[in-house]
UniProtKB/Swiss-Prot annotation:
SUPFAM superfamilies for this protein: Protein kinase-like (PK-like)
Catalytic activity reported: L-seryl-[protein] + ATP = O-phospho-L-seryl-[protein] + ADP + H(+); L-threonyl-[protein] + ATP = O-phospho-L-threonyl-[protein] + ADP + H(+)
E.C. numbers: 2.7.11.1
Occurrences of domain Protein kinase (ranges): 60-341
UniProt cross-references to InterPro entries, sorted A to Z: Kinase-like_dom_sf, Prot_kinase_dom, Protein_kinase_ATP_BS, Ser/Thr_kinase_AS, Ser/Thr_Kinases-Pseudokinases
Membership in a protein family: Belongs to the protein kinase superfamily. Ser/Thr protein kinase family.
Active-site residues from the entry: D201 (proton acceptor)
Binding site for ATP: L66, G67, A68, G69, G70, F71, G72, S73, V74, K87
Protein keywords: ATP-binding, Kinase, Nucleotide-binding, Proto-oncogene, Serine/threonine-protein kinase, Transferase
Protein name, UniProt field: Proto-oncogene serine/threonine-protein kinase mos
Broad class of enzyme this protein falls into: transferase
Length: 346
């Protein structure tokens, strides 16, 4: 599929035009012949061809807008009768190049399958007539609620029915629940990092909670493939992400490593545990203090002081947001620590 987007240097080869290319689509799975004879896994409850072929627009039924941001909108929908989420990236934004990069970055996980990662079903740069979208991505429906909504008690669908409950998972975030969700997130990070992908915008709002009470990492619009960064000492464009969760080395313009996600996880775990916002004050003052004075959210709250589990959890957070990326744990030993903590206290 020839793409109108001038981003060939950043595109995985499987999304580039080829003799065998099918129309309209950025495939979420390679044909079997490209996988050394292996048969691609079947997409659950969807026709197999749709895993890599063009979007069948007649089978798309938008149900409800779940949210909107600077680059576009996300809808709950059905695709061939299966519940999905559809992200449409707008053409008319202040920074069209950033919108295009965000669209293609979402496809960094297009062929990946993991219980704690929102799966891409299909994607296309062709859109229905009259659409203001430069691209559409169909993803599995990861859940009605985000971790941010569970932590802070926001409505499940800000634009939906006012009477809907804020959380489908039943009850407040206990320490055991924090550990359970943390294990889900770190399992997802471990898988991503094993695929040389860094999320770079991990935060509660980008973690969905399914009806089965499983956390799934979503929104890969800021993600990077480490292999794509090896040719350059610094990225060719400003990195995205949320400043409150951005690792200090990224704020200083240094190189990207998986340890940046570990830092973001530490801020997220602190939010789960305290149910507070990480910082208050002017953005520039916070950015400067994080880099120059190692500013971090406070670990003096009673939850980190009054019990042994809380103290141990505070130690985990402290190690994960160390100023030096090299001193932070990677996802695997972090998973071991959290598993031990969950078994002991969860």
């Amino acid at each position: 599929m020839p793409s109108p987007l001038a981003l060939r240097p950043y595109l995985p080869s499987e999304f580039s035009p080829s003799v065998d290319a099918r129309p309209c689509s950025s495939p979420s799975e390679l044909p079997a012949k490209l996988l050394l004879g292996a048969t691609p896994p079947r997409a659950p409850r969807l026709p197999r061809r749709l895993a890599w072929c063009s979007i069948d627009w007649e089978q798309v039924c938008l149900l409800q807008r779940l949210g909107a941001g600077g680059f576009g909108s996300v809808y709950k929908a059905t695709y061939h009768g299966v519940p999905v989420a559809i992200k449409q990236v707008n053409k008319c934004t202040k920074n069209r190049l950033a919108s295009r990069r965000s669209f293609w970055a979402e496809l960094n996980v297009a062929r990946l399958r993991h219980d704690n990662i929102v799966r891409v079903v299909a994607a296309s740069t062709r859109t229905p007539a009259g659409s203001n979208s430069l691209g559409t991505i169909i993803m599995e429906f990861g859940g009605n609620v985000t971790l941010h909504q569970v932590i802070y008690g926001a409505a499940s669908h800000p634009e939906g029915d006012a009477g809907e409950p804020h959380c489908s998972t039943g009850g407040p975030l206990t320490l055991g629940k924090c550990l359970k969700y943390s294990l889900d997130v770190v399992n997802g990070l471990l898988f991503l990092h094993s695929q040389s992908i860094v999320h770079l915008d991990l935060k509660p709002a980008n973690i969905l909670i399914s009806e089965q009470d499983v956390c799934k990492i979503s929104d890969f619009g800021c993600s990077e493939k480490l292999e794509d960064l090896l040719c350059f000492q610094t990225p060719l464009y400003p990195l995205g992400g949320t400043y409150t969760h951005r690792a200090p080395e990224l704020l200083k313009g240094e190189g990207v490593t998986p340890k940046a996600d570990i830092y973001s996880f530490a801020i997220t775990l602190w939010q789960m545990t305290t149910k507070q916002a990480p910082y208050s004050g002017e953005r520039q003052h916070i950015l400067y203090a994080v880099v120059a004075y190692d500013l971090r959210p406070s670990l003096s709250a009673a939850v980190f002081q009054d019990s042994l589990p809380g103290q141990r959890l505070g130690d985990v957070i402290r190690r994960c947001w160390r100023p030096s990326a090299a001193q932070r744990p990677s996802a695997r030993p972090l998973l071991v620590d959290l598993t031990s903590l969950k078994a002991e206290f969860g």
